[in-house]
């Protein structure tokens, strides 16, 4: 159908895919550089969510170092970072007890702020628009466009009003081609176009395999007596076993609200493990449940995290564009922070891209994209590189298990201060770590009580999902039968457990199992694209404005 459609086009100096912290920081920095150099440049940001911040999900405890550089007067301009961290606690949990651990430098949040990433992103969008950046929410970047020489020309937004059969409906609107001298991919973790770019330009050929986590988060309203504004708690241990990397957080922010979340490394081995159920179980711990008893859950969401760090970063630039933020993988996993690193990567990219921008009024056009090759050098000379270098050995050490990994981390961070004369390797791709079901023990999860613990469907309701049912599937199976022949028969259908939204379901049809995909439940976490054992599932963007609206998450 695409071949027969005529799409309109628009020309910009820079097109940015994704209105998250990195995309908006890049847009703001580019406009600042243009003003400083007395130039006018056009910058366009496309965002698949219904508004800037709709798909933004993080803890979030924010280190303001990058924001201080980008917008020094952010306090005067009303940035929604108002709840400073007042106390840090680190716990190791057993089934019944909690042990206080020393607060290591990675968990020292003095000077940081507990905030809603969605609110911060909306504020950044306002700052960008005030500088003349054009932001188009509700438009999913569906295709990368290329010049004849293979360099990136821009992107095309997805068609709207296409039916489930792939044919135009009465409300059909073709996508728009957005051409640019430079295209910045800021899609976040496991971005669908970023994934294509990395593969096409072989940007990861000198990198170690990327590794990921799944983060699941709820927001609760609790009583004033239980609310401790500014308190930040991180925990390790129970309910996960000693072979599985993960942990939890509890953040007390404003208005009697508490954010609680759980992260599981997607290199886990047991196909019977359910990150969602482990999260619900975590809340039943005596030390944790006392905060939430009598409270009310008001929001829910989930998102994959990119955990590989420095040694898993791909090459950052290619002809016609760059990767920024979590699309590349700048998360500092030991600190459980990626917002300030995403913003800094974007600022460095903007500084590398800006000198390449020609005045299009003085040239007839362009038929090739230039490469911002010094983006890599700028990164390596920045505090961002130093921070990721110091953190590089923590995540891969957990391939030895939680106890040895924790011991190594203590030595690496407290004695070597992240400057050990070696760099550890990751142990392979996450989907390859899953063991066959026959070699693993099923895990018995209790039924939720609907008060402290919940099921997936009631949780997804709180993610404020929007999804047009009559549209093509955005969860594409290379071979549908593989979901039965391999996933069901050999791995006991792990997607029915790792998906935090109940998208994947085994149903009986004529006495035989069939995979049913409930695409309308999808919260865009991308876990299936990462963890499927044969990489049979590909996540692509659904129609623009689909998915969650996280609001104050």
Where are these regions (language model features)?
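N-terminal Rossmann-like FAD-binding beta1-loop-alpha1 element of flavoenzymes
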Residues: 14-44
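Glycine-rich Rossmann-fold phosphate-binding loop(s) that bind the pyrophosphate
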Residues: 19-20, 48, 117
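N-terminal FAD cofactor-binding segment of flavoenzymes
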Residues: 40, 44, 48-95
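A short alpha-helix-loop-beta-strand transition element characteristic
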Residues: 71-87, 138, 204-212, 368
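Predominantly flavin-linked oxidoreductase catalytic cores and closely associated redox partners
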Residues: 127-288, 348, 352
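FAD-binding beta-loop-beta segment adjacent to the flavin cofactor pocket
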Residues: 302-333, 460-470, 482-498, 505
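Active-site-proximal substrate-binding core of FAD-dependent oxidoreductases
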Residues: 329-335, 351-401, 516-518, 548
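Iron-sulfur cluster-binding cysteine motifs and their immediate structural context
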Residues: 489-520, 527-549
